[in-house]
Amino acid sequence: MDLVGVSSPEPGPAAAWGPSKCPWATPQNTVSCSLTEVMSEELAKELQLEEEAAAFPEVVVAEGPFISGENIDTSSDLMLAQMLQMEFDREYDAQLRREEKKFNGDSKVSISFENYRKVHPFEDSDSSEDEVDWQDTRDDPYRPAKPIPTPKKGFIGKGKDITTKHDEVVCGRKNTARMENFAPGFQVGDGIGMDLKLSNHVFNALKQHAYSEERRSARLHEKKEHSTAEKAVDPKTRLLMYKMVNSGMLETITGCISTGKESVVFHAYGGSLEDEKEDGKAIPTECAIKVFKTTLNEFKNRDKYIKDDFRFKDRFSKLNPRKIIRMWAEKEMHNLTRMQKAGIPCPTVVLLKKHILVMSFIGHDQVPAPKLKEVKLSNEEMKDAYYQTLHLMQQLYNECTLVHADLSEYNMLWHAGKVWLIDVSQSVEPTHPHGLEFLFRDCRNVSQFFQKGGVTEALNERELFNAVSGLNISADNEADFLAEIEALEKMNEDHIQKNGRKAASFLKDDGSPPVLSAD
């Protein structure tokens, strides 16, 4: 069989000088393909397949139930993915904590990145050593439900069902919820399970009461810390006493030995001072520390003893009440110093530090000397004590130019067979507007005590007043006697304002009303 090729007629060559033909109208030439070439390509393809089959034999895979679509289980994969995600979240949270710690540093104001955490507090069980049960408080029955907030437009609803922000029920529930903002110590009651509604009037009254109670508690707390109480001292006073012991002036403070309306007295053992040799003053072996109370409860009604005293009159109006108490301690120091120079038995002043006065201790081995009210004396000792008291009153009036103003059996001690005078912080000079009245009151207290004690020689208050002051006031009854005393005080006060004299000795040589001496 002859192989016959199939071919298309070829066009002849075109003349160069002939007219040009359009390329779109020119048919494409068909490439002829012989039968021999086709047979050779199929043979080559078969040979290639045989070689591939020989080189790569076919692997037969047996069919099993594990590849069926009905039994596919991916729960373990989901759990692994969740565990991996949780680990990634914890690493992210740890990185946030490091960044937060680095960002805050040692600053007192810190910024928290807790809102950017990925792990929930309930799931983050490894973040704390102690296992704490986390409880979602969103549905806590013990937490009152928050009122529905009012939108910006100011009302809710439409038509007849409009509810404004001024609605009585809405305002009542809001006021009930606002009670949680009161101070922790303010009792607001338990309203669980009750739909409480407080009116604006009641809520405003409660709010004002809560604020006033908070301010009052703060004042009481401050007053307790900054004021002395009975048998106790405030921190500032305690610090002053500690400095006295630390400096070596006092060896030790044993405890409280007496309490009064204005002061508390402590016992202490004396030490030594660095400038003790220079001053020539030795600290007693036993000392009494008189701490004036800073509560101001008793001093408010006792300012008349100091504001009219010319020694402190100019300073009294310029001081606040707390500094006035320090002036009381200073006044007692000056009075004791004046009495000590006159030889009157009284405590010796060692040191004055603000409102703390250190004096010599009248007693022995931490046992204070008894008061005349407490001691039991025989008739001879009581008589001796009376004449000693009379002499001390005359000596205090004439030599010290002072009136005790609170002399009684409670402010006189019996020690070593002598009468000792104490508590002279309120003592004034006779030129005081009420000095003679204070002297008459002292005479009454002394006369009544010794008359009750069995001293028949004791003078009455009018006779004792004339004996001490040297004035010859003759009056049959107490009312007339007091009237003459007030008249004398008025004359003396007018004389002081007219002449400007500050001397305190009365002229007693003539019978005229007492005036101030020129010297």
Curated annotation (Swiss-Prot):
Involved in regulation of type I interferon (IFN)-dependent immune response which plays a critical role in the innate immune response against DNA and RNA viruses. May act as an adapter protein essential for the recruitment of TBK1 to IRF3. Phosphorylates IFIH1 on 'Ser-828' interfering with IFIH1 filament assembly on long dsRNA and resulting in attenuated IFIH1-signaling. Can inhibit CASP10 isoform 7-mediated activation of the NF-kappaB signaling pathway. May play a role in the biogenesis of the 40S ribosomal subunit. Involved in the processing of 21S pre-rRNA to the mature 18S rRNA. It is found in: Cytoplasm. It holds the Pfam family RIO1. Residues 122-159 are annotated as: Disordered. Autophosphorylated (in vitro). Gene3D superfamilies: Phosphorylase Kinase, domain 1 (3.30.200.20), Transferase(Phosphotransferase) domain 1 (1.10.510.10). It comes from the Eukaryota. The modification Phosphoserine is found at residues 8, 112, 125, 127-128, 512. SMART domains: RIO. Belongs to the protein kinase superfamily. RIO-type Ser/Thr kinase family. GO terms for biological process: cellular response to dsDNA; cellular response to dsRNA; cellular response to virus; defense response to virus; innate immune response; maturation of SSU-rRNA; negative regulation of canonical NF-kappaB signal transduction; negative regulation of MDA-5 signaling pathway. The keyword Signal does not apply. The active site is at 406 (proton acceptor). Residues 124-134 have a biased composition (Acidic residues). Residues 251-519 form the Protein kinase domain. This is Serine/threonine-protein kinase RIO3. Keywords: Antiviral defense, ATP-binding, Cytoplasm, Immunity, Innate immunity, Kinase, Magnesium, Metal-binding, Nucleotide-binding, Phosphoprotein, Ribosome biogenesis, Serine/threonine-protein kinase, Transferase. ATP binds at residues 257-265, 290. GO terms for cellular component: cytoplasm; preribosome, small subunit precursor. The lineage of its organism: Eukaryota, Metazoa, Chordata, Craniata, Vertebrata. InterPro entries: Kinase-like_dom_sf, RIO-type_Ser/Thr_kinase, RIO_dom, RIO_kinase, RIO_kinase_CS, Ser/Thr_kinase_Rio3. It catalyses: L-seryl-[protein] + ATP = O-phospho-L-seryl-[protein] + ADP + H(+); L-threonyl-[protein] + ATP = O-phospho-L-threonyl-[protein] + ADP + H(+). Interacts with CASP10. Interacts with IRF3; RIOK3 probably mediates the interaction of TBK1 with IRF3. Associated with 40S pre-ribosomal particles. GO terms for molecular function: ATP binding; caspase binding; metal ion binding; protein serine kinase activity; protein serine/threonine kinase activity. Its EC number is 2.7.11.1. Its cofactor is Mg(2+). Its main location: cytoplasm.
